[in-house]
Amino acid sequence: MNNKPMLNAYPDSLGGKLSDIAALLKKKEMQDTFSSFYILPSLYHSDLDRGFSVVDYNLNEELATIEDLSQLKELGIDLKLDFILNHASAQSPQFKDLVEKGDESEYRDFFIDWNKFWEGHGVMTDEGYIQPDESCLKQMFFRKPGLPILMVEFPDGRRVPYWNTFYQEVHGREYLGQMDLNIKSEKVWDFYRETLEKIASYGAAIVRLDAFAYAPKAPGKKNFLNDPETWEFLQQIHELAAPLGLTLLPEIHAAYEEKIYKTLADKGYATYDFFLPGLIIDAIENRRADYLAKWAREIVEDKISTVNMLGCHDGIPLLDLKGLLPEDDIRSLIDLIVSRGGMVKNLHGQKNIYYQVNATYYSALGESDSKMLLARAI
């Protein structure tokens, strides 16, 4: 990776297909503008979360073809593609096989059986799932209210709880959502290996590891960035990726004050983090560069390699700013963006805490063309 600008786009962001973006990048005016291109994951077959709920990693040929990817490579542009390590869609062939065959499915342990995981660390409820001990719950990091469970109905009528950190929707025995993978299953590691090989075959140079920090789990742990399990897991993924010529880019969505980015840098990884969007809004709206410059200075002095962006499908990250901006300034930033139409998304645990503001970057800047151009220039 280098320090030149990276284009971030969905396959249908400019025109209706990836071929339209390739045609744009071929224009004389665009030559040498971008050294790399992050193609977001609706490139694959997906069903939710703007591409981040992957059904399978085959190309969605309604939007992109291998010829499109080859054209981009011929322009000298490195491709960055996603691999979502923690979960797969409830519409994935593995999960559909589990729903269809139950205990007879070869993917019975591909996903995390909640009761098997918590056996010996909680009490069975009348609803058929184990309620973890309070000592364990106090340690856990939650992404939504309640326990992260999806009750899956097997063919014999039994309802079996499976770990479901993110979205879920249930209609009888039809499921939508993102089901957590059991990284202790050999089949999951076969899946990881095959997927990395497939991504490499598309010509990718960089693989962004989405949600990797949720994958290692253990009773009594936070189950987000577990130490040392997360770093051991990342090393195993590296050992699969390196022979394929793939550079890993772990995604970190955590408070600056936790210094996870420094841990990754110390272990030799670049990071995909979310500090820049809020810092630039703060700099522009408050007419000051202090906090933005302090962060940039740290990156340069400590030789930290990082990939940043401004807008994303989730909105403007805020939790990440803790330790970078004073708390009152973060709250003021939230109020400003909400006054411009944004909506606050909270995390759920023992108490609600802000996570991000759902808004486009243009809206967050008050729909000002000059501010948007300045943000992009920075």
Predicted segments, located by residue:
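Active-site and adjacent substrate-binding regions of carbohydrate-active enzymes
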Residues: M1-I378
